[in-house]
């Protein structure tokens, strides 16, 4: 805590500034629904919301770096005037950042998964700012337990990383963000196929739904807990036959997703405007497909002794239905692109042959 008269005035000014930021940015905005309530009449001349987002993320990141420097241990106590200036410089672009959001929310080219990512990154930034403000408020009140971290302000690092995420949103755009999501989807499909491969190499028949209830049963006799004998080799061959076929289906779906992902970031792909609803549908359906793939594999592994194809009949039917929905949406996106539409048609023929 500063001791001189001038320094004490700076302490008061800084505390007032911190309280003001708390009231302006941190109290009102704690969840995505709060951000959606922002009303703005922001009009951009000669620019776009995406370009402005990138500029503001860069400016915020630069001011965040300066704040980290002037607030580090050993520097903060003698630098309150500079700290006030840097925090003010940070709060101005933050205000403009939030005023941009209605332009994204009301834009028919911005799918929900994209604005969800914006919300997540912005709330991370505000969470970091919330921690930072709380740390400085405690420090100014001379709380004996307060500290600014031994090495650096962790909260400043959170803000810095959130600025990077916002910048990534602006650079990638809706199509690039979806491409990033699909990259993870493809990796999960690889994991699923590896899981199948590992099970076939080292089959485990110990899993059984009856095991869940064993601890609750009285052990009155050996026969009560005995399991039905089964032909392990026959069961294994049945599961192997199913898994071999199912792996081919996963590979084909992976081909669809990975090819579509490459299209999204391809320079020769020029989608029409107002495709947010189509992109959201594709995103949703592909998530459903991944869940169904995992559900089928889990069903087989959960009770392998009693497995029959009938056990996953509903899941496979649902998989076919949702995949056809994806193809319809992809075809919409490929309107005016006969080469890619033809590829979709060819893929669907092969898909129908497997199912």
UniProtKB/Swiss-Prot annotation:
Q: Name one Pfam family in it.
A: GCIP_N
Q: Which residues form a coiled coil?
A: none
Please verify whether the record's keywords include Cytoplasm: yes
Location relative to the cell: Cytoplasm
Q: Which UniProt keywords apply?
A: Cytoplasm
* CC annotations in GO: cytoplasm; nucleus
Please tell me whether the keyword Cytoplasm is annotated for this protein: yes
Family annotation (InterPro entries): GCIP-like, GCIP-like_N
Q: What else is known?
A: Present with 9100 molecules/cell in log phase SD medium.
Name this protein carries in UniProt: Uncharacterized protein YLR287C
């Amino acid at each position: 805590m500063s001791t001189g008269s001038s320094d004490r005035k700076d302490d008061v000014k800084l505390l007032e500034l911190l309280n003001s930021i708390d009231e302006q940015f941190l109290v009102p905005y704690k969840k995505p629904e709060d951000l959606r309530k922002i009303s703005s009449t922001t009009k951009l001349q000669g620019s776009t919301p995406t370009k402005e987002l990138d500029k503001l993320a860069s400016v915020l990141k630069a001011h965040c770096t300066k704040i980290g420097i002037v607030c580090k241990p050993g520097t903060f106590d003698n630098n309150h005037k500079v700290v006030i200036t840097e925090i003010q410089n940070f709060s101005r672009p933050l205000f403009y950042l939030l005023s941009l959001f209605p332009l994204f929310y009301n834009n028919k080219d911005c799918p929900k998964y994209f604005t969800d990512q914006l919300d997540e990154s912005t709330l991370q930034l505000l969470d970091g700012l919330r921690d930072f403000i709380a740390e400085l408020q405690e420090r100014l009140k001379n709380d004996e337990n307060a500290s600014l971290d031994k090495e650096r302000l962790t909260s400043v690092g959170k803000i810095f990383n959130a600025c990077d995420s916002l910048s990534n949103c602006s650079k990638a755009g809706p199509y690039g963000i979806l491409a990033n999501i699909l990259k993870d989807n493809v990796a999960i499909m690889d994991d699923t196929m590896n899981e199948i491969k590992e099970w076939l190499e080292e089959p485990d028949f110990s899993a059984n739904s009856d095991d869940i209830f064993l601890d609750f049963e009285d052990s009155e006799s050996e026969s009560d807990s005995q399991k039905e004998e089964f032909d392990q080799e026959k069961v294994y061959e049945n599961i192997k036959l199913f898994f071999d076929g199912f792996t081919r289906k996963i590979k084909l779906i992976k081909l669809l997703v990975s090819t579509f992902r490459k299209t999204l970031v391809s320079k020769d792909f020029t989608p029409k405007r107002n495709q947010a609803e189509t992109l959201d549908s594709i995103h949703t359906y592909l998530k459903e497909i991944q869940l169904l793939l995992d559900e089928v594999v889990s069903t087989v592994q959960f009770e392998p002794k009693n497995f029959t194809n009938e056990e996953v009949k509903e899941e496979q039917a649902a998989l076919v239905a949702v995949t056809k929905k994806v193809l319809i949406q992809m075809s919409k996106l490929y309107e005016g692109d006969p080469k890619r539409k033809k590829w979709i048609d060819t893929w669907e023929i092969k898909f129908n042959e497997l199912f």
